[in-house]
Amino acid sequence: MKPRNRFEKAVLAESKKLRPISKTQCKWAFRECIDHFAYRLPKGRTTCMDCGHSWTIEKPTDTCTCPHCGARLQVKGTFQRKIRQKQYFTILTACGEYQVLRMFLLSVEMEKGCKTSSYTFEIGQYWWNAQGRKTIIAVQRTLGRYIDTFSFCSPMAVRNDNEAYRHISYSPIYPKFKVTDTLRRNGFEDNFHNIVPTELIPALLSDSRVETLLKSGQIPLLKFFMHNGRRSIDSYWASIRICLRNGYHIEDGSLWCDMVDMLNQLGKDIHNAKYVCPTDLRAAHDHYQTKRRARQERENIIKKRKEAMEAEQAYKQLKAKFFGIEFTDGIIRIHVLESVQEHLEEGTAMHHCVYDAHYYSKPQSLIFSATKDGERIETIEVSLETMKVVQSRGVCNKNTEYHEQILALMQKNMRMIEQRATA
């Protein structure tokens, strides 16, 4: 793709000035980015796949050191003679005023008795100017089953960013960095803190808030925002400034942001150090979570009561002829629920869905409550179509020791319910 503006033209020109990858960098990639094996035969003859040297290991083992090249190897019992490995790696460097992340493919071929042959191929480069503006110089990506299929014969040119280049940018990075003065000034100290370079570098160059978090050592909070989108930082920045002003270190970014959200919902002052700088973050988080849950429960009860009042008239028109039905065997008393409010109270006390599932609005269902000594024991649903008990549930939908007795009492008095239905 041809460069479309001055920025892309300047970057393309600068990319031609980059030095080839050094032998030291290639050696690091070979040593750190791929697996190293010793192939062992059943009788103990072992071959280092790095240098081709053979020796005998009497007893099976998981790892060993090659006596010839000193490589630390994983011992693998196999008759295989060849192995091929590929791995991406990256190098952070600077070119003129630009920060550059170079991406390489390391391809290694190993064969028994031979020294390893390897080569590196440059896939592409991420370029950023001092303001964090980005462009990509890379080989062309081709269509295929895998995201990282490239046309290695294509020229290095300006490309659109895509998942293939982003995928490679997550690869291991050479530990010796060369950075621009601007990036160094903005707080970068040769540590990405497990944040992808393609996310941290442009953020650090373009967003002063990221610079502030990095310089103040608020790394857990910085990682949280980088992993969850920097847009959300706006909602918390005023509270973050309170923490910075009071020298408060946020040990868990996710937990702290959750706590601030809960404080906001509870109507607390999130600009007050008393709330946003707790001595024990986890204890404070759990405390406000409990308070928010209690508030939500109160709001739900109010909402349900309002719904019950609105549904009350319709329920009376639908089931009024059954009101007053009550029977007992001397131990258990069973009566029909005569209002939506009673359905709400029954569902709350018994911890089931008789109210939430709107049983009061079902024209062919009639709900009864079974009690013993004034305490609820089971809730019964009767079908007005079949005049049979559909279900009878105790607390948390479990059957009680009185379950069969309740069913027998319901069956004995089903004629009374049927008479009311036909009246």
Provide a role label for each language-model segment:
Residues 209-210, 214-423:
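Catalytic-core elements of nucleic-acid end-processing and repair enzymes
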Residues 1-312:
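Sequence-structural signature of the catalytic-core scaffold of metal-dependent phosphohydrolases
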